Amino acid sequence: MMLRAWRLMVLLAAYCYYVFANCSISTTTAPVEWKSPNRQIPKNITCANYSGTVGGNVTFQGLKNKTEDFLSWLLGSGYKSICSFFPQLPGDSNEQHYRYEVTNLTYNCTYDRLTLLNLTTENSRNYYFRREDANSTFYYSCYNLTVS
């Protein structure tokens, strides 16, 4: 029964995308990387769904990055930066990054993951992982968190 429902969702999403070229149906549970031609979060991006409990933790895994990529974890579609990582310089093994103060958010981040700590219901929202490669091409992955 679940397999039939999943197949129906996939077919519906494909039809919706083919006819309207923009859909908001989520059919995946794993994050997918979306290439952005205009450096903006793609309008048809599909978010991976995550759930957490109040007081718990959740970890988002970033996708496909290299040491020469510029990486950022973002809070919501307003592009509020949580932390950013800069390309490593040749011969320098130190990680170059900035960590930003975000109200009502306790977290740890590395170049490939973001862990939210001591979750509250205020943490329910979309989070984005942005990667800019050496050719200045932007890629995004989306994580939709629901805390209950």
Swiss-Prot record:
Disulfide bonds: none annotated. The keyword Glycoprotein applies. Belongs to the RL11 family. GO terms for cellular component: membrane; virion membrane. This is Early glycoprotein GP48. Coiled coil: none annotated. Keywords: Early protein, Glycoprotein, Membrane, Signal, Virion. It is found in: Virion membrane. Residues 1-21 form the signal peptide. The keyword Glycoprotein applies. N-glycosylated and possibly O-glycosylated. Glycans are attached at N22, N44, N49, N57, N65, N104, N108, N118, N135, N144. It is a peripheral membrane protein. The gene is UL4.
